[in-house]
Swiss-Prot record:
<keyword id="KW-0810">Translation regulation</keyword>
<keyword id="KW-0963">Cytoplasm</keyword>
<protein>
    <recommendedName>
        <fullName>Flagellar assembly factor FliW</fullName>
    </recommendedName>
</protein>
<keyword id="KW-0143">Chaperone</keyword>
<comment type="similarity">
    <text>Belongs to the FliW family.</text>
</comment>
<comment type="function">
    <text>Acts as an anti-CsrA protein, binds CsrA and prevents it from repressing translation of its target genes, one of which is flagellin. Binds to flagellin and participates in the assembly of the flagellum.</text>
</comment>
<dbReference type="Pfam" id="PF02623">
    <property type="entry name" value="FliW"/>
</dbReference>
<keyword id="KW-1005">Bacterial flagellum biogenesis</keyword>
<dbReference type="GO" id="GO:0006417">
    <property type="term" value="P:regulation of translation"/>
</dbReference>
<dbReference type="InterPro" id="IPR024046">
    <property type="entry name" value="Flagellar_assmbl_FliW_dom_sf"/>
</dbReference>
<dbReference type="InterPro" id="IPR003775">
    <property type="entry name" value="Flagellar_assembly_factor_FliW"/>
</dbReference>
<dbReference type="GO" id="GO:0005737">
    <property type="term" value="C:cytoplasm"/>
</dbReference>
<dbReference type="GO" id="GO:0044780">
    <property type="term" value="P:bacterial-type flagellum assembly"/>
</dbReference>
<comment type="subunit">
    <text>Interacts with translational regulator CsrA and flagellin(s).</text>
</comment>
Amino acid sequence: MVYKTKLGEIEISDESIFTFEKGIPGFEHLRKFALVFPQETFPIGWLLSLEDSEVGLPVVDPKLVRADYDPAVPSEDLEEIEAENQEALLFFCVLTIPPGKPEKTTINLRAPIILNQKKKKGIQTILENEDYQLRHLLSEEIERSKTVV
């Protein structure tokens, strides 16, 4: 189906659509989002609202940025998205890209977006691990990962 989104009108398959029962912090009134990976921005993807064409969050697989990223998801969050365990879940972290200053891009490792592909449900959780902050400079995390791997 074709949807009007922050990235323009795009074809979105049902497999890419997820329901966030409680919305996403800051967008609690929005429930339906699609995860898309345009060729122009890959490996950065977009979590696009299907209810408000102005809302779209740039996201990336945190393992591409921090090789040792190992979130411990609270059990109540796993229950909310009907996940039996973490193994079958997809994790994405939101990027903040300042206009005109892409070198200042930060990644939010503290509050990942978690998607249950099987149930098509998602949640943004807040992790207890204090090593993960709301704003990590993306370039520093990529450099750090080179020494970890």
